[in-house]
């Protein structure tokens, strides 16, 4: 079946949305949230950042760096896939990339609160690894079964949200918008009150 779609740009864009979502969500968790936790636990932030303006500048700088990194990963992935399938990118491919960038910004800001959890670097790494695995598994399960608990979890599943938004003509549910709106507000508050002292310093 795959061989029948060589050179089919439209089919290819529909198939890669899940992978683009996985790559982008990985960057959000590990290049952004985990990095912020790591800088805090290493004592870097407490040593060099002493004001709320400094904290916001540090978080904003890491957000921009992670966004650039995610764009590079996505561009590389799409390039390799299109070359492998002998497909030519069109204007919709550019739109796909731009939409991915916009979703990444939303996800990074909305999930900033996770970096403020008072846990060690190793614990945060474990939490993020489990989280991305669960999100990916539930996303795969939803391809065959998307009822009950699986459906409700996938409403806020970041990878599923990427896939939904990258597909033309599909809209998010009001519950998704409400939940991520609340997460956005919580993340803004957590950025303003971001603790700079590492967890081990208070133990």
PLM ranges: what are they?
Residues 1-11, 102-106:
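Long, highly hydrophobic alpha-helical transmembrane signal-anchor segments
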Residues 14-34:
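Long, hydrophobic alpha-helical segments
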Residues 25-30, 61, 91-99, 172-175:
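Short alpha-helical transmembrane interface motifs in multi-pass membrane proteins
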Residues 31, 35-67:
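Helix-loop-helix units of permease transmembrane domains in multi-pass membrane transporters
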Residues 63-125:
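Alpha-helical transmembrane segments and their short interhelical loops
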Residues 113-117, 178-203:
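Junction motif at the cytosolic side of a transmembrane helix
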Residues 118-153:
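Transmembrane helix segments
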Residues 145-178:
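Short hydrophobic, aromatic-rich alpha-helical segments embedded in or entering the lipid bilayer
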């Amino acid at each position: 079946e795959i061989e029948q779609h060589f050179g089919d740009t439209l089919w290819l864009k529909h198939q890669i949305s899940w992978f683009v979502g996985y790559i982008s969500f990985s960057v959000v968790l590990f290049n952004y949230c985990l990095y912020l936790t790591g800088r805090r636990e290493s004592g870097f932030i407490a040593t060099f950042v002493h004001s709320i303006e400094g904290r916001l500048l540090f978080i904003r700088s890491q957000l921009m760096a992670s966004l650039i990194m995610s764009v590079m990963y996505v561009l590389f992935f799409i390039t390799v896939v299109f070359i492998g399938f002998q497909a030519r990118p069109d204007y919709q491919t550019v739109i796909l990339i731009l939409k991915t960038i916009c979703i990444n910004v939303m996800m990074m800001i909305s999930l900033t609160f996770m970096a403020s959890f008072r846990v060690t670097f190793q614990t945060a790494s474990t939490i993020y690894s489990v989280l991305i695995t669960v999100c990916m598994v539930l996303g795969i399960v939803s391809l065959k079964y998307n009822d009950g608990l699986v459906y409700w979890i996938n409403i806020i599943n970041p990878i599923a949200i990427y896939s939904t938004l990258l597909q033309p003509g599909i809209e998010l549910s009001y519950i998704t918008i409400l939940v991520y709106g609340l997460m956005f507000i919580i993340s803004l508050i957590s950025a303003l009150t971001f603790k700079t002292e590492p967890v081990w310093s208070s133990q």
